[in-house]
Amino acid sequence: NAGGKIAMQILHAGRYAYSDKAVAPSSLKAPISPFIPSELDEEGIENQISDIARSAHLAKAAGYDGVEIMGSEGYLINQFLVRHTNKREDRWGGSYENRIRFPLEVVKRIRKEVGKDYLIIYRLSLIDLIPDGSSWAEVVYLAKKMESVGVNIINSGIGWHEARIPTIATSVPKRAFSWVTKKLYGEVSIPIIASNRI
């Protein structure tokens, strides 16, 4: 009654999935899972994009005001972005343009599925806290790309789950990572949400 909105988060764990059916951009075991994921082939990648877009369609049909795409914290979409987990040499890996193809295709497909007026939030990893993570220039570039393909709001993702630096424990000071969100101000014209120990 107060005018609030509710969005459903769409998350694919990728190599973090606790299952022998886990899939990822490359067959690399995560340090926080005992399972080695299978590398997605072209058909598998297309199926993942279609499934995520269908999830957005179902969220809209169920009455949600929007969706948040989990593109951070080391989950599947984030795994495509960085060399740490993406060792592919096809059009989904190698150059940064190729590595961002998966998240961009996800957003484009969702926008096509839900229409131009539906809320899309993208949780973008602003700081990975792992070896071979995204550079700041890459983060800014992807944020701008996300805005250009129809994202309405960027939510700040801080650190991968396998990172050795705590980000949400009660020992972490309040607003400890809000400086990273502030650093992105001015780079995009859409709203940015700060997160972690707020």
What name fits each language-model region?
Residues 1-198:
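Flavin-dependent oxidoreductase catalytic cores
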